């Protein structure tokens, strides 16, 4: 009579653990992920990912796609769509009529975007008004360090790149929350409403602009001080935010997780875990059929 263990052995199949079956593959994966972590740290937004990807593509011999130009098998090209997405290809030996193979991934990730007129002051604190992008758990975005990324188009048409909070010595930003012993009413909310979307406003300053020649001071002096600092850093004014694309993301770096360092903790792995691997797979493609 066949025992249950014998039947299980003969009829079932268990996916092998790569760390047990192939030590070399595990070591290769660890080495590969060093580049992946570096990419996660420096390509947190669509624009940054696109720019970093173009650098890697150019280094690998890819050139911008030219419409109407004839290409031969093995030619490597890329096309950038308005600085926020891109396509890349190695031409295969088969004609287009034989079909194509596509590998697609999205490079945007959940974040906090600034509203068009975001700067305001309340109770002698200056804030940015935000609206969340993507499927976020809003309570996860409070009391964590945030970095400011994006671009601003000035009145003269100049594009200004903005990044604050990623480099050593940079200030960071945050969304505040109530102390546990002061949040009794908040504690009664359902999990999804613990922090509401309209409460995801970012602290940008608490010191007023001081003008010793003005005895009474000015209205919204903390807001003015924040704007003065931004003007000093980037030469922008409040009106320039109407032509801006500013995003706030966690100001953290990718790190190994666990004593065995077998996991990666980082912002933006949805879906850069697919986008980065698609990018490197394309670069590694040499002589495809399709």
Which sequence ranges carry the predicted segments?
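N-terminal hydrophobic/helix-forming segments and targeting peptides
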Residues: 1-290
